[in-house]
Regions:
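Non-heme di-metal
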Residues: 1-261, 266
Length: 268
């Protein structure tokens, strides 16, 4: 289990999101790559090899790409969790320019070029490079193991620890708070068990495959630990110690608690 991040100021919270947003984006690379292997969208269509897993992965993608927001955040409307996270960053005055620049390069020049962008913090780049190497293996059970053990089963505890430690006030960062709570609920109660089923079905009891899955499990947990530790080191260097519960004007603009349900606006 990665160490608990100590976030004591609004500046540190902003800094955390500016690093972590790349992991949120990286999650979608992993998820969509797994979908491409289990439920390919190409033409001509052929029946999927694992029909039940095709259904599972499509359900997971739908929840991540088009979740319904509650009324208090401007809903009901549909947004991807990535767009929601970006809106949460804007709400607390975090800098979205780096992730926006990387997305622009990815859209026009491809992911490999985007991964070289100097705006990516080094801890985030190392974390994404590891995911990229797993994706390039093209092995469904490798990707499913990374998704299960490095994301779905791990994230609820990570986010719960953040919420318990940071105590986000609803007027302070309601969108970020809802994002964390949503993932704790979805991943803990639904997506985590589905991910475990996916791994089990892909392995089908084969000892060699199970051994590979265990190696991936250890690797992704180790890399998540390293990512969290690197962020912790960066946060320790943040000098703004203004308490989270009392944001002040000199800390910069803190946005509205209502998310604009305009995907194109959120993408800018």
């Amino acid at each position: 289990m990665p160490q608990v991040l100590l976030i004591r100021s609004l500046a540190q919270l902003r800094l955390f999101t500016e690093h972590h947003v790349f992991a949120v984006w990286d999650f979608m690379q992993l998820l969509k790559s797994l979908q491409e292997l289990l439920a390919p969208a190409g033409v001509p269509w052929v029946p999927p090899r694992y029909p039940r897993l095709a259904g599972l992965i499509n359900d997971l993608v739908a929840a991540e790409e088009c979740d319904c927001l509650p009324i208090e955040l401007g809903g009901p409307c549909y947004l991807s969790h990535f767009s929601l996270y970006r809106a949460a960053m804007q709400e607390i005055g975090a800098d979205t320019c780096p992730i926006d620049a990387v997305l622009a390069v990815a859209a026009h020049e491809g992911l490999d070029r985007a991964m070289l962008h100097p705006a990516i913090p080094e801890p985030s780049r190392r974390f994404m490079q590891s995911t990229r190497s797993l994706i390039e293996s093209g092995q469904p059970h490798h990707l499913a193991a990374a998704f299960c053990y490095g994301r779905e089963l791990l994230v609820p505890d990570l986010f719960r620890a953040l919420l318990d430690q940071v105590h986000l006030h609803q007027l302070h960062a309601p969108t970020l708070s809802w994002y964390f709570e949503r993932h704790i609920s979805l991943d803990g109660d639904n997506h985590g068990p589905l991910a475990e089923q996916m791994v089990a079905e892909l392995c089908e009891g084969r000892l060699g495959t199970l051994s590979e899955v265990d190696a991936v499990r250890k690797r992704v947990i180790r890399e998540r630990d390293a990512f969290w530790e690197s962020i912790a080191a960066v946060l320790q260097q943040a000098s703004d110690l203004q308490p989270l519960s009392s944001p002040s004007a000199d800390q910069g603009p803190v946005g509205s608690a209502v998310v604009a349900c305009d995907p194109e606006a959120l993408a800018r």
